């Protein structure tokens, strides 16, 4: 059963404690359903840790989307409807990134997702002296192959949860803000047909995180 974190400061203290006990780089893997607020939470944790002198970097898995051209060749012209599902990511490369983030002592370039071009771009960099990695993404704790290899490279695992009704509205607004839909109602429909389906899969097919933060 997962422990419960009551505040971001509790997560910061937990990361500090782990870092004090681990030689070399620390890697913490964070999962959660789309719209739960993972990125916001881990960025707050990273800012606090960097302020304490622990060089911390947030790395997201969104850059490991298959490019749209490749995705269309894989599943057809309506691939955009399914983008964000587990099979629309290059899982093998995500696993390899998890290994590098934990084990490499060199600078590590990595892809991020450009919302301007709606495709991955190689513009991220983890510097070799980074002490702690916060690797966040929807599917990082799936118990499906090959995703289930990721936890072998994690010093700790965290989950972020949020009320499902809030998640649905946040996702709809996100789709509207990014130009994927033209009305909030269309955003809700897209959330229902894709993001919330993926969220249900995450809940049902992920290993429990060591500690869970309930977002508000």
How should each PLM-predicted stretch be described?
Residues 35:
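Walker A (P-loop) phosphate-binding loop of P-loop NTPases
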Residues 38:
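Conserved lysine of the Walker
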Residues 123, 145-148, 176-216:
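Small-molecule kinase domains that catalyze NTP-dependent phosphoryl transfer to phosphate-bearing small molecules
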Residues 1-29:
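Extreme N-terminal, non-catalytic leader segments
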Residues 32:
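The Walker A (P-loop) glycine that initiates the GxxxxGKT/S ATP-binding motif of P-loop NTPases
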Residues 117-175:
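ATP-dependent NMP and nucleoside kinases share a basic, alpha-helical "lid"
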Residues 57, 66-114:
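Conserved nucleotide-sensing/catalytic segment adjacent to the nucleotide-binding pocket
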Residues 41:
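Hydrophobic positions on the alpha1 helix immediately C-terminal to the Walker A/P-loop
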């Amino acid at each position: 059963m997962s422990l419960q974190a009551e505040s971001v400061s509790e997560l910061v203290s937990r990361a500090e404690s782990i870092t004090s006990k681990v030689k070399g780089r620390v890697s913490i893997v964070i999962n959660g359903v789309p719209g739960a607020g993972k990125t916001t939470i881990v960025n707050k944790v990273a800012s606090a840790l960097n302020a304490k002198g622990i060089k911390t970097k947030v790395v997201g898995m969104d850059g490991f989307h298959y490019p749209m051209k490749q995705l269309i060749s894989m599943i057809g012209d309506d691939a955009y409807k399914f983008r964000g599902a587990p099979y629309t990511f290059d899982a093998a490369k995500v696993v390899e990134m998890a290994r590098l983030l934990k084990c490499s002592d060199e600078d590590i370039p990595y892809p991020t997702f450009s919302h301007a071009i709606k495709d991955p771009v190689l513009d991220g960099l983890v510097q070799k002296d980074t002490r702690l990695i916060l690797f966040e993404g929807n599917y990082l704790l799936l118990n499906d192959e090959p995703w289930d290899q990721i936890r072998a490279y994690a010093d700790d695992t965290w989950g972020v949860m949020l009320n499902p009704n809030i998640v649905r509205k946040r996702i709809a607004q996100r789709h509207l803000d990014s130009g994927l839909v033209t009305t909030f109602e269309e955003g809700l429909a897209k959330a229902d047909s894709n993001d919330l389906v993926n969220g249900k899969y995450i809940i049902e097919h992920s290993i429990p995180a060591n500690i869970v933060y309930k977002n508000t």
